[in-house]
Amino acid sequence: MIALTPRQIADITGGRLVHPEDARVATPVDGTVETDSRLVTPGSIFFALRGEVTDGHLFVEAATSNGAALVVAERELETTAPLVVVDDGVVALSRLAAAVVEHVRRLGRLKVVGVTGSNGKTSTKNMLRAVLGDVAPTVAPQGSFNNHVGAPISMLRIDETTEYLVVEMGASGPGEIARLVDIARPDTGVVLKVGLAHAGGFGGIEGTRAAKAEMVTDLPATGTAVLNADDDRVAGMASVTAARVVTFGQGASADYRASDIDVSASGTSFSFEHGDASRRVSLRILGEHHVMNALAALSVVGEWGVDLDRAVTVLEGVTRAERWRMEVLDAPGGVTVVNDAYNASPDSVAAALKTLAQITGPDHRSVAVLGEMAELGEYARDEHDRVGRLVVRLNVGQLVVVGHEARHIHMAAGLEGSWDGESVLVDTIDEAYDFLQGTLRAGDVVLVKSSKSAGLRLLGDRLAGVTA
């Protein structure tokens, strides 16, 4: 973070210094901003936030023991570090992030890109980090730091040397992306896809569309909206932005295009076209859906003047997004596990199942281990039903459905024609593990996919013998 004194931070956040006479309030701090006391290192700023599970105020002593140079809290506490008291910790965090981004922007070098969409945000963010980081100092979040707390923390990682800031913007309800846009004020906004992820919080897919459109509605006329031309709901956002519109997709009208896509167990390749230029791109990332993520990243960097040949070379070196995202693992006994269970939505499950079918050779068996897709609200039954039918239509050899909330996948597979044990329903991860241990054989390719809350990512690790 840029260096600021506790007094300056109090002014920015609208807070109150508890001991303004302390000489340390005039000493600049420039450490990381943390909300988890375990991540605090000497010089960090600790924001004590109240969460759904615990309260950061309970860990102020731990934070100062780890070297916190400043504590921002919602009430007075006994602490050895300077203390700023604010009315709302999340609002204070947002104000600080906005001020830091604006300060660095005024230096004249910083460009900010915001990325949103029902699927693909983290993968696209990682691609942008790789390409832009090859060009100049770049800050992008680790993991999925994309909500009202994680995104501002990521923004606060920048300093005066940062030239590119990549902000992943997620939401589970209306207005959340707009608030993040107001903090970061991106020069470029990317919308990847509108799907049913978190549909329960948006009131349906049209509510999701409106929420994702918040990314581009407030972009300045000097900015750029990068839109998926293959998704009608995203392409239609061109009518609600004052920014210049750039498109990506597989259609001939897209500004950045992909064709001739090939998916194998070693990765995904496609022909990339922009203007009159064309070249083959070979990604080491598994899944056809990553082609659109790569196109989005290439659209951003291309419009920012990065040499596209250089960008492609960097992308071809990217291996995977994060843990549990199409992570290919060699399991004991000659079994391949594709652990994609960080999260799940109807679109991402369909894409993962399609990839499973594409990479499993004719002499091997495909196995899908599926759990609940959470936060679908009234769409839950129908969407789980569709997944079950898709499994059968893709000729997946064995389906294992884990958990009561996912039962409609199993039931639909039976109605679609799965029989003689091709689909089984178990209640727990332990039961799934025991069943798979008894049925898996050399050459099997196993997809593990569920929402994070279902915990199947841990089953995928267990099957592959991963312990950390």
Task: Go through each PLM region and give its residues.
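Acidic, Mg2+-coordinating active-site environments of NTP-dependent enzymes
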Residues: 10, 16, 73-81, 188-336, ...
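Active-site beta-alpha connecting loops in nucleotide-dependent enzymes
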Residues: 53-54, 322, 342-418
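Non-catalytic positions within long, well-ordered alpha-helices that form the structural scaffold/packing
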Residues: 60, 64-65, 181-182, 392
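ATP-dependent carboxylate/acyl-activation modules
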Residues: 115, 121, 133, 323-327, ...
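Short, basic phosphate-binding NTP loop
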Residues: 1-114, 123-134, 156, 323, ...
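Residue-level signal for inorganic ion chemistry
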Residues: 9, 44, 63, 96, ...
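Phosphate-binding loop of NTP-binding sites
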Residues: 92-229, 235-241, 438, 462-468
